[in-house]
Structures are given as C-alpha cells and as structure tokens.
Amino acid sequence: MATIIDGKAIAEKIRADLAAQVKELQSRGITPGLATVLVGSDPASEVYVRMKGDACNKLGMHSVKITRPAETTEEELLALINELNNDPAIHGILVQLPLPPQINADRVLEAISPAKDVDGFHPYNVGRLVTGKPTFQPCTPYGVMVMLQEAGVDLAGKEVVVVGRSNIVGKPVALMCLQRNATVTICHSKTRDLPGRVRAADVVIAAVGVPEMIKGDWIKEGAVVIDVGVNRVGEKKLVGDVEFAAAAERASAITPVPGGVGPMTITMLLHNTLEAAKMAGSGNR
C-alpha cells in the first residue's frame, strides 16, 4: 500500500516558516501585499479568491480583493492593472481566471508587471523558467516539486510521465522535472497508447481534468503518483484524475484528492508574494 503524500501537512509546515519571514519583513517596515482581481461572480472563482485572501491574512500579509462586474471592459481592467502595478503596497497581482468573453486574458496577464506576477504566467517569467533562470514559478507545478522533495523523491534519471499539456500545469511541471534531470514524456489527447506510456513511468503527474482517467492497473509497481486533478462527481464527491484506491495498491507514494496538491497551490502563491515583497524591499526588481 502506498505512502500518502499529505499536502495539507506539508503546506502547514511551509506556511509556519513563511509566517516567521513575514514577521521579519514587517520589522523592517514591509508588509507583503497581494491584490486579487475578480471580474464577474463565478461561484468557484469567488471561493478561490476568498481562500487566497484568508490564507494571506493568517500569515499577516496585506490582502486586497477587488471585484468588478461581468460587463467590465478590457480597457477598464487594464487601467486597474496599471494602478496596481504602480501601487507600492501591492507586491503581487493575481487576476482570477476565467475572465468574461469580452476580455482577452493574454493581454491582461501580459499587462501585469513581471515583478508582481506571482502566478508566474507572464511571458517574461515563463521565458526565464524555460531557460532555467530564477523567476516566479507557477504555483501548482511549484507545489508539486516541493511535495516530491518533501517525499524524498529524487527525479534525477527517473522516467516521468506528465499527462496534460496546459500552460498552467502540464508544460511548466514538465520543464521543472527536466531541470531536475528527469527524462520527461508529455502525454495528451492525441497520445497513442496512453496506458503503455504510464506503465513505463517511475513518476506519474496527472493534470488532465478528467475524473479517474488514469486507471490503477496502469501504474507501475513502486511508482510515485502525483494527482493534480480536482473533479466533482455528483453533488459532493471530489475525485482526482487517477483511480486512487487501485493506484494506491501499486504505487510507493501517492497524493490524495482532496488534501494533496490543492493546499500546496495557495501556499506557493504566498511564497511567491513574500519573495516579491523581499525583492521590492531590496530594490531588486
């Protein structure tokens, strides 16, 4: 039976360390500030924004939630981003996706100052990630890397299969594994023989958004399974992209859903916001 990689416990440990660092910064007159921007009233987005704000407040960070109606124009949103870029009390800017159809999300994300891009989505920061330079790393992939490290998984020489190729998780997590000397295969909807690819993997990272798509008997004996997916089945049940119970019989370690990668995403957002505040305080932007 697999060891459960407890994302909640790892996140709590990291947040305790972050809280101590926030106090130290505050002693120098700097309080890390995060602005979250929500356009419209998507219920799931409202929950995510509230969770991010609550997490900031618990650490002693400054949190600002800015809501705009769904009919907000792209020009109005870009003007708001410009204001936040020039606000010295704000170190991180997060625009909650998805945005209404009249707004081009790429243009909005590119308008955020790279020094305040704590989501790691700006092309400047993506380019630095690709070339292996220090940068804000996207929060979910960063959380996955920290979980693997905490679980004692050394990726060097390992066969890693990433299922999913999104800009938010699949592509960046594959890059991060490559930088840690793994041999990486990215699978997607056009991949031939997905079960065969997964069966060859020492580490499986599932980020495709399809409930229990990765079957337990696809998992190699002793493999490590990181399940990024969060899918609602019925009214209350949450499941990942991996068939958890069956996979846990074969894997050496596995993340649960919920309680796995999810808590790490917000934790790494807090980490990035703290780093942005440190850079602003040192004038290194």
UniProtKB/Swiss-Prot annotation:
Entries under Pfam families matching the protein: THF_DHG_CYH, THF_DHG_CYH_C
PANTHER family: C-1-TETRAHYDROFOLATE SYNTHASE, CYTOPLASMIC, C-1-TETRAHYDROFOLATE SYNTHASE, CYTOPLASMIC-RELATED
Keywords: Amino-acid biosynthesis, Histidine biosynthesis, Hydrolase, Methionine biosynthesis, Multifunctional enzyme, NADP, One-carbon metabolism, Oxidoreductase, Purine biosynthesis
EC number of this enzyme: 1.5.1.5, 3.5.4.9
One GO process term, biological-process aspect: tetrahydrofolate interconversion
PROSITE patterns named among the record's database cross-references: THF_DHG_CYH_1 (PS00766), THF_DHG_CYH_2 (PS00767)
Annotated family: Belongs to the tetrahydrofolate dehydrogenase/cyclohydrolase family.
Pathway(s) of this molecule: One-carbon metabolism; tetrahydrofolate interconversion
Job of this protein: Catalyzes the oxidation of 5,10-methylenetetrahydrofolate to 5,10-methenyltetrahydrofolate and then the hydrolysis of 5,10-methenyltetrahydrofolate to 10-formyltetrahydrofolate.
Example GO molecular function: methylenetetrahydrofolate dehydrogenase (NADP+) activity
Superkingdom classification of source: Bacteria
Protein name in the entry: Bifunctional protein FolD 2
Assembly mode: Homodimer.
Record-listed NADP(+) binding positions: G164, R165, S166, S189, V230
Cross-referenced InterPro entries: Aminoacid_DH-like_N_sf, NAD(P)-bd_dom_sf, THF_DH/CycHdrlase, THF_DH/CycHdrlase_cat_dom, THF_DH/CycHdrlase_CS, THF_DH/CycHdrlase_NAD-bd_dom
GO cellular component, as recorded: cytosol
Catalytic activity: (6R)-5,10-methylene-5,6,7,8-tetrahydrofolate + NADP(+) = (6R)-5,10-methenyltetrahydrofolate + NADPH; (6R)-5,10-methenyltetrahydrofolate + H2O = (6R)-10-formyltetrahydrofolate + H(+)
